Amino acid sequence: MPSVLWILFDGGGDRPAGGKTPFHAAFKPTIDYLTANGSCGILDPIAPGVRPGSDTAHLALFGYDPFKYYTGRGAFEALGADVALKPGDVAFRTNLATVDENGVVIDRRAGRYIAPEEAKAVEDLMKKIGEEVGRKYGVEVVYKSTVEHRGVLVLRGAVSHRVSDTDPHKVGAKMARAEPLENSKEAALTAEVVNELSRRFTEAAAGLEINKARRLQGRLPINAILLRGGGYMPQIEPIRERYNIRAAAIAGVALIRGVARAVGMDVYTAKGLGGTKDDVFDEAVKLAVELMSRYDVVFLHVKGTDSTSHDGDFNGKVSVIERLDKALAPYLDALLKNYVVVTSDHATPVGVREHTGEPVPVMLYGPDVVVDDVAKFSELTCWRGALGRIRGIDIIPILGSYLGLSEKFGE
């Protein structure tokens, strides 16, 4: 029985620059061969004009209405970082950042690359601060670094996810104070804890040896932790029960691993797939093809297209696409006997450096899929294809139908 390899370029969608997008400019003969022999269209990850987060977009793509199931990004980050969540826990996505003496954000990612020894130093400092603040307020504090500047913070106790972000979401703005979003003791306490953790980290970070070294190297110091997306663990029917599909996900980013785990996918990692713009995809693609014999759908997440977009790096984004395509090439014959989906979870145009709400290209190859006249995978071409305009939440039902796994609606 055939299965599906689903390749997702995070933030892969873009807007034309000089008449081309990164997908259009990239030399990707394997993906374009599948495109020329498949059906294409455009996809609204959530709905037309809605600017998706990566969390809400992946919920929709995996077949779950984010307006119903989304409970905040933090819980998915924690799941993906192998932090076990208990009922009542509140989790936040964190960014290591750089602020000036007035608390104004200079870089929301502290230069993005955080060396392992730097991440360990931050974890050690946060453990010390967390224990002290936790004793003061009667809560447990857990912090864990994940990839690059990213991390997760979990609060356990009489806490609430109903607090505002401290991340201002832009450079040049002052790091915000967490404020309760409801009139409850739990929300007020949570805001106090978050603000004290943030303040004490910034005060203590100045003395970290890693920051002395970073300054000598001409790099930005790590002197702030920005929190956003406070949330709790949602109750979600597993994908096997909801859609009769055995699914696996291969991802290097905690958020995507977490969303996949939340919907009941088996989650894998691969050598070279760290969730960065420098990822090497050979082992990840090899693993994906091997897993296709055990699963109905194998999802492969490519983070580098989003990271390069946020950095405004057109050529870097093209390079990520081309490296993935090159890793696919040795397996083309095997893929031709199965189904292949290529799409994005949202557009992150290089010229905007942020998520935007336009549709992204989508391609479905399969032995029995209608072949349209689109020959190149790109925003400039896929809109002409046979798939038309679909939503993210439509992908899994479409795949279930081709695989013969979906139930008939009515008689």
Curated annotation (Swiss-Prot):
Enzymatic reactions:
(2R)-2-phosphoglycerate = (2R)-3-phosphoglycerate
One BP term from GO? glycolytic process
The entry's keywords: Glycolysis, Isomerase
| Entry-linked Pfam families | Metalloenzyme, PhosphMutase
Q: What is its EC number?
A: 5.4.2.12
Q: Which pathway does this chain act in?
A: Carbohydrate degradation; glycolysis; pyruvate from D-glyceraldehyde 3-phosphate: step 3/5
Question: Enzyme class, one word?
Answer: isomerase
Known SUPFAM superfamilies for this protein?
Alkaline phosphatase-like
Q: Which GO terms describe its molecular function?
A: metal ion binding; phosphoglycerate mutase activity
Q: What's the stated role of this polypeptide? A: Catalyzes the interconversion of 2-phosphoglycerate and 3-phosphoglycerate.
- Name the family the entry cites: Belongs to the BPG-independent phosphoglycerate mutase family. A-PGAM subfamily.
Could you tell me what this protein is called?
A: 2,3-bisphosphoglycerate-independent phosphoglycerate mutase
- Provide the species name: Pyrobaculum arsenaticum (strain DSM 13514 / JCM 11321 / PZ6)
